[in-house]
Amino acid sequence: GEAFLMLHRNKKPNDVHEGKWIGVGGKLERGETPQECAAREIFEETGLRAKPVLKGIITFPEFTPDLDWYTYVFKVTDFEGELIECNEGTLEWVPYDQVLSKPTWEGDHTFVEWLLEDKPFFSAMFRYDGDRLLESQVDFYE
């Protein structure tokens, strides 16, 4: 069946995502496009060569005390290679019907559902206070 490759963040010290199951990702490097960043991060963390497809954008106002986070959400169905050991956590193929039962950010459950349902391109906002989701909004674009 179909599955998401998820990362159980259980290896990095002082990790804002510690203990949570999240998608693979990372920060843009200078001069890099979001697409290039996604492909690079996927390769660095998983060993897979992937062709990421942009599905949405999420804003996280004041996700850390001094920073807003702007996140590009990609979905990958076209990839090749063998999984490697990840230094940020444990990689696991999680069947679609089990993804929403994994401990993660509350907002992640929401946008993972959008990916599972193949919703149109989205622009969303999730505002947190620590681990608690305070507010969210989304626009879908046909």
Locate the predicted segments by residue.
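N-terminal strand-loop-strand
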Residues: G1-I22, R49-A50, L54
